[in-house]
């Protein structure tokens, strides 16, 4: 295995995922559409807040609050794309990304299969979100009693109701898409982190696989062997430091975003569950909610899974270090080995606070939060 200068990634194995989650929003027309949708739904949300708090009776409040709660997630998604849209667009320029064939054919096939699976998942879930958005283009009689916007158009702008409703419905094409975009961005970042960690792990695992003498005890006094180990250790340490720097830098960038998105995700889940509990379910609404729930649950599950795999891969690097025959290293090499082991034992996570990271535990906490809030609200009805 080569421990010299590596070829850098030219062709992104997750380019489809990057395009639908970032690149497409770099065009001027995309930004104009985002501003337009933000203006429309931001205005409706502000007016809806006034009506929910001061105008609607209890029954109306329970009818309208599910769709109201569900609007905060896409609004946050739009704001982030407009003001923090460079999150993953230049990741290849922020750290040297090795080609996925840098650690042998077996690892190459493994990473390629993982990237193919993630690409297929992204495309299928993207299509589900688009179809889900299209369903909102079809008017349902219950819309006027479910969405604040249609209630306002019907009661305050009857002459322009058809025109205003059509414009508002068109925005759902983008909203369905926006529900998955930022999950895709974190998945893209996490997956590339996992691939690069896998490549590093293979280099660590083969670090002491030099041609050995028959008597292994003599390796400690073999200057040529120790020199080769030294070069490989330094190579792996430098790579791990760059990787840690990238994770820490990205964690600083997304610290606040993940927390706020988690809160909005809870509100979205509460809105969906409240609508299911309302009993106002027709065939059309069931289909809408089914696609929304499937698409959202799928991308959130993939998000937590990707974050968890970054942690798991970090632990595998530690295991690979422990498996080395470090007792054959000389004093200087042992010091370098201990430095790398100490750094590696600090598990790398995609996190937004000291206590919470993007992993399975966060997913469980969100589900528990949704359940607790729903229980309180049901008891209040």
Residues covered by each model-derived region:
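Terminal membrane-anchoring module of integral membrane proteins
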Residues: 2-35, 119-125, 210-381
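Active-site-proximal helix/loop capping residues that flank conserved catalytic or ligand/cofactor
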Residues: 86, 132, 165-168, 195, ...
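Transmembrane alpha-helix/interfacial motif
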Residues: 60-81
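Inner-leaflet juxtamembrane helices
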Residues: 74-95, 183-200, 300-324
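Generic structural signal for well-ordered, non-membrane alpha-helices
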Residues: 44, 70, 90-93, 172, ...
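Helix-loop-helix junctions within predominantly alpha-helical proteins
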Residues: 2-65, 97-190, 195, 202-222, ...
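A short linear boundary/processing microfeature
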Residues: 94-98, 203-206, 323, 327, ...
């Amino acid at each position: 295995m080569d421990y010299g200068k590596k070829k850098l990634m030219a062709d992104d194995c997750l380019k489809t995922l990057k395009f639908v989650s970032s690149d497409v929003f770099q065009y001027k027309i995309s930004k104009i559409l985002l501003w337009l949708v933000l203006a429309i739904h931001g205005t409706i949300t502000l007016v809806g807040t006034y009506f929910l708090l001061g105008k609607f009776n209890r029954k109306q409040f329970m009818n309208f609050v599910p769709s109201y709660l569900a609007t905060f997630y896409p609004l946050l998604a739009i704001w982030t794309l407009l003001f923090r849209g460079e999150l993953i667009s230049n990741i290849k320029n922020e750290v040297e990304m090795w080609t996925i064939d840098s650690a042998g054919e077996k690892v190459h096939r493994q990473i390629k299969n993982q990237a193919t699976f993630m690409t297929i998942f992204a495309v299928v879930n993207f299509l589900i979100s688009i179809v889900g958005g299209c369903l909102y283009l079809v008017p349902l009689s219950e819309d006027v009693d479910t969405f604040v916007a249609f209630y306002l158009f019907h009661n305050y702008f009857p002459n322009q109701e058809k025109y205003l409703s059509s414009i508002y419905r068109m925005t759902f094409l983008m909203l369905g898409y926006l529900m998955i975009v930022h999950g895709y961005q974190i998945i893209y970042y996490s997956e590339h982190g996992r691939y690069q960690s896998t490549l590093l792990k293979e280099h660590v695992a083969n670090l002491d696989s030099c041609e050995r003498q028959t008597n292994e005890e003599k390796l400690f006094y073999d200057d040529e062997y120790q020199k080769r180990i030294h070069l490989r250790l330094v190579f792996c340490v430098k790579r791990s430091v760059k990787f840690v720097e990238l994770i820490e830098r990205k964690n600083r960038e997304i610290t606040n975003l993940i927390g706020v998105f988690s809160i909005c995700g809870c509100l979205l889940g509460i809105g969906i569950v409240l609508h299911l509990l309302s009993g106002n379910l027709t065939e059309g609404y069931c289909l809408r909610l089914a696609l929304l729930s499937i698409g959202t649950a799928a991308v959130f599950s993939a998000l937590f899974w990707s974050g968890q795999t970054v942690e798991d891969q970090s632990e595998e690097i530690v295991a690979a270090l422990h498996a080395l025959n470090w007792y054959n290293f000389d004093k200087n090499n042992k010091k370098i080995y201990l430095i790398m082991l100490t750094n590696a034992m600090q598990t790398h996570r995609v996190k937004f606070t000291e206590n919470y990271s993007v992993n399975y535990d966060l997913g469980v906490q969100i589900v528990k939060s949704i359940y607790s809030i729903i229980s309180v609200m049901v008891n209040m009805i």
